[in-house]
Amino acid sequence: MEKVQQTIRAPRGTELQTKGWVQEAALRMLMNNLDPEVAEKPEELVVYGGIGRAARNWESYNAIVDSLKTLESDETLLVQSGKPVAIFKSHEDAPRVLLANSNLVPKWANWDHFRELEKKGLMMYGQMTAGSWIYIGTQGILQGTYETFGEAARQHFDGSLKGTLTLTAGLGGMGGAQPLAVTMNGGVVIAIDVDKRSIDRRIEKRYCDKYTESLEEALAIANEYKEKKEPISIGLLGNAAEILPELVNRNIIPDLVTDQTSAHDPLNGYIPVGYTLEEAAKLREEDPERYVQLSKESMTKHVEAMLAMQEKGAITFDYGNNIRQVAFDEGLKNAFDFPGFVPAFIRPLFCEGKGPFRWVALSGDPEDIYKTDEVILREFADNEHLCNWIRMARQQVEFQGLPSRICWLGYGERAKFGRIINEMVANGELSAPIVIGRDHLDCGSVASPNRETEAMKDGSDAVADWPILNALINSVNGASWVSVHHGGGVGMGYSLHAGMVIVADGTEAAAKRIERVLTSDPGMGIVRHVDAGYDLAVETAKEKGVNIPMMK
């Protein structure tokens, strides 16, 4: 990948570079994904998650920008793995952009084949929100991480992480949310990363409190704050596959253990034991096969240590990076003895059609987001947990790129909020249109047997019809852009998932599209879980009037 040193920043204000606000939204969100405040390696078009890119290469990026600038309001741009391939006449209620990223026929859906295609310039890895142009920085996963640790606290620690120590690793674009999510729940956390730049970035953005290169110092600080029952987050420079076994040997067992290293990609995401970043980069280039094998061996040691900690009493869970699968394939037959975070903590929310709903102020004015915060606090005042999240986010979350907010809203709530936002744009309360979207990690848009659909009640973990149906219904209902991706979160061969974005531009046409899309999208989550036999989903469907032909 050619590196290009240029600073990309989304335009602000109300002056259009395109022929309509929906096209403008797509352009600004693509550019926002590559803002240095947002992206992990913008010079390589990498947004987050190892090699999750916004466009296939710089030539494709420039062609996408040019296409969006000339796209009519009754045309649709097609993007194939980060490359613009066609513009067709459609209609004003159709999506302005349709994206398909990283999709491979199942028999060939593996990293080796993907890398062959990538080398030839035929494919890119879109992760989830990188290639679908709706990444908002670490805040994008923060509330989900907060909810996960909050539910762990409710199940195991009397509702709070006060006086507990969490041990984790991985402080990239996704994992970087962990330190703040733990301290928001009152706990102490040691978060390990091999890359000092990642820790520095989290400290700079106020997601992490302290930095150290010493395990002894990290433990001393952690013990001090644990005894005081005060929250603190410590970024520890090192390799988790070395540090976790060392702690097991010393019989130092945390209360909670998880991991968010980029284990989904053994070549580009994980650093083997005994290698500096520079040495790893050299080996990756010279002998990728040996690199991958060393990575897998290190991951196996990492998982062995997590299992040992679980055996000694630590609440241990997988945070969706496929590290258990790698260890299992390497011969560690009990790798799946600790659960994934979705079946352990999140699935009841999915049954209610809840998931990570986000919105972005295209104006670039933080005041627009603060006004929408007030809407949440007013309209959902009976949901104290949600309101508490909004108040904490306002105080503690620093915007990256265009101002944005995330919160978990359910069926009915999303459409209600979307209607209000559109009205606020129409009457001038907000200074420019708002982009509404979500992560692909949502209640009805993913098939991922080692993550979102792990341990489904009816055994339908690997059924991938659901994300396809999700993308189809959102497209016909008028989402502004819709994406279908493969391999996000857990790597090639292990997931299919869909994303959607809808623009609230204040028009009556947008109001109708918002009502349709923000009903069908979370509705798919309820439908998917009703079909799998979850009683809570059935109750929710009946209460909300979701029409499911064979529901009993």
Curated annotation (Swiss-Prot):
The active site is at 407. Gene3D superfamilies: Urocanase like domains, Urocanase superfamily. One of its GO terms (biological process) is L-histidine catabolic process to glutamate and formate. One of its GO terms (cellular component) is cytoplasm. The keyword S-adenosyl-L-methionine does not apply. It catalyses: 4-imidazolone-5-propanoate = trans-urocanate + H2O. InterPro entries: Urocanase (IPR055351), Urocanase-like (IPR023637), Urocanase_C (IPR035401), Urocanase_central_sf (IPR038364), Urocanase_CS (IPR023636), Urocanase_N (IPR035400), Urocanase_Rossmann-like (IPR035085), Urocanase_sf (IPR036190). Pathway: Amino-acid degradation; L-histidine degradation into L-glutamate; N-formimidoyl-L-glutamate from L-histidine: step 2/3. It is found in: Cytoplasm. NAD(+) binds at residues 49-50, 127, 173-175, 193, 239-240, 260-264, 270-271, 319, 489. The keyword NAD applies. GO terms for molecular function: urocanate hydratase activity. Transmembrane segments: none annotated. Its cofactor is NAD(+). Binds 1 NAD(+) per subunit. Pfam families: Urocanase (PF01175), Urocanase_C (PF17392), Urocanase_N (PF17391). Keywords: Cytoplasm, Histidine metabolism, Lyase, NAD. Its EC number is 4.2.1.49. Catalyzes the conversion of urocanate to 4-imidazolone-5-propionate. Belongs to the urocanase family. This is Urocanate hydratase. It comes from Bacillus cereus (strain G9842). The gene is hutU.
